[in-house]
Amino acid sequence: MQPPAFKELWIILRLAGPLIASQMAHMLMVFTDTVMMGKIGPEALAGGGLGAATYSFISFFCVGVMAAVGTLVSIRHGAGDSEGVTRLTQAGLWLAWGMALIAALLLWNLEPILLQLGQAEANVHMAAQFLITLPFALPGLLSFMALRGFTSALGRAGPVMTISVAGAVANFVLNYAMINQWLGLPNLGLMGIGLVTAMVTNCMALALAWHIKRHPAYAAYPISKGLSKLSRSHLKELWRLGLPIGGTYAVEVGLFTFAAFCMGAMGSTQMAAHQIALQTVSMAFMIPVGISYAVTMRIGQHYGAGNILMARTAGRLGIGFGGSVMLLFGIFFWLAPHWVIGLFLDLDDPAFAEIVVLAAKLLAIAAWFEFFDGTQTIAMGAIRGLKDARTTFLIGLGCYWLIAAPAAWLLGFYADGGASGVWWGLALGLFCSAVALTYAFEWKTARLLRKEAVGAAVPG
C-alpha cells in the first residue's frame, strides 16, 4: 500500500468517526423513547411501537432523499464551486421543509389506514396519540440532515457528533423528567415522548445552523444570504439524485419489516430471538453506515476535482476496511453469542431457555450477515459518490425483494428452516447485493478511467 493510500484511509476514518458516533446517538434516542414507552405501560409500548414503526418508515425515506445534499455538495466542493455548494445547501433546506410538511400531514391522517390494515383498535388509538406530536420533529430532523450533509462534505463532521450526543442526552433527561413529573412537569404519556423528541430534534438543527453561521470555516458559504430565493435547478438536481436514495432506504427497511412479519407468524419465541439478534446487528451496523457516508463524501470530492483514480482508491479502501471490521464483529458473534444475549436476558432463567438457544443460532448466522451487509452498504455509498443512485436502487430492489424476501419465506416456511431459514434468506440477499454493488463500483470507475484516458489522448 502506497503512502497516499494510508493518508486517504486516515482521512476517511477521521470523517467517519464523528458520523458513526452521530448514528449511535440517534439510535440511543430511539432506544430511550422505547424505554419510556415501557415505563408508561404495556399498552403504550405496543401502541407507541406501532406509531414509531410508521414514523420510522416515512422518515427513513425522507432522510434518504436528504442524503443527496452531502453527495452533491462534496462534488461541488471538490470542483471548487463555493456558490454551487451554497445554493445546493439552500435548496436542501427547502426540500427538507417541504417533505417535512407532506410527511407530517400523512402521519396525522394515518389512523383510518392503520385500522384498514387490520391493526388492533387499541394500538392504533395509542399510536395516533404518539403521532400527534412526533411529526413536529420532522422539520428539525430533515434540516439537521441537510446541514449535516453540507458540513460533512466539507470534511467537518465534528460538530455533528457533538450536537448529536448532546441531543441524545437531552432526550433522555427530558423524557425521564416528564415521565417522573420532576419540577412540576406534566406526564403527557406518549404525546409527551413525541413532544420531547420534537423539541430536542429541532434544537439540534438550530444548534448546527448557529454553529455554521458563526464559525469562520463556513464564511465562503453564506447559506442564510439569499435563502428566500429558491433555486429550482438545484432543487431538481437534489430530487433527481435523492429520490432513488430514499427508495433504496425504503426497500431495505421494508425487507426487515417483512422479516419481522415472518417471525410474528412463527411465534413469540422466534420474534423475541429475532429482536435480540437484530438489535445487536443494528448497533454494529452503525460503523459501516458512518464509513459509507464518509466514503460518499470523499469520493464526491475526488469526482468533483476530476481525480477518478483517487475516487476509486477511496472506495476500495472504504469497502476493504469496513468489510474487515464487520468480519471481526462476525467472529465475535460466532464465538461469544451468549455474552451478547446476556445483555438482553437472564441466561439462568428457564423461562428464556428457548429464546436463548434460538438467538444464539441467529447470531451465528449474523456472523456472515454482518460482513455482507457492511460491504454492500459501503459499496452503495461509493457508487453514490459518483453521482449515481439509480444503480444502487435497482440492485437493492432486485437483491432485497427478488432474492432475499422470497428466499427468507421459502427457507423459513417451506423448507422448515424457521427463524434461522429467514435469516439465511436475508443473508443470501445481502451477499448478492454486496457482490453486485462492489462489481458495479469497479465497473463504473474503470469506465470513467477509460474515458479520462481517451480524453487525455485527444489533442486539445
UniProtKB/Swiss-Prot annotation:
Subcellular location per the Swiss-Prot or TrEMBL entry: Cell inner membrane
Membrane topology, as annotated: Multi-pass membrane protein
CDD domains found in the cross-reference section: MATE_NorM_like
Entry's Gene Ontology cellular component terms: plasma membrane
GO BP terms in the entry: monoatomic ion transport
Known role: Multidrug efflux pump.
Name of the protein in its database record: Probable multidrug resistance protein NorM
